[in-house]
């Protein structure tokens, strides 16, 4: 099993959610996040004063899937989240050793 963590622009969330649904993934976790990379921050003007906004709003999506679905899911995220501009985000893929559904006690792929 694999865990896919994707950090994307917030306005791309619905497109990514739909793309994941199309490859057969239904359950995702979404967390509002702030961060910066190469995009860095920017300067804003508020009531006549300039200030630097270091951290930009992002959305972090987490999904656990079977190994054979992972590459299709990553491609779906890339295609749905890409704008071609700096700040489109990152995708991290890691191995998951175990999954347990708390309600039933199911383990492994049955618990996804």
Where are these regions (language model features)?
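Positively charged, small/polar-rich N-terminal and surface patches that mediate targeting and assembly
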Residues: 1-112
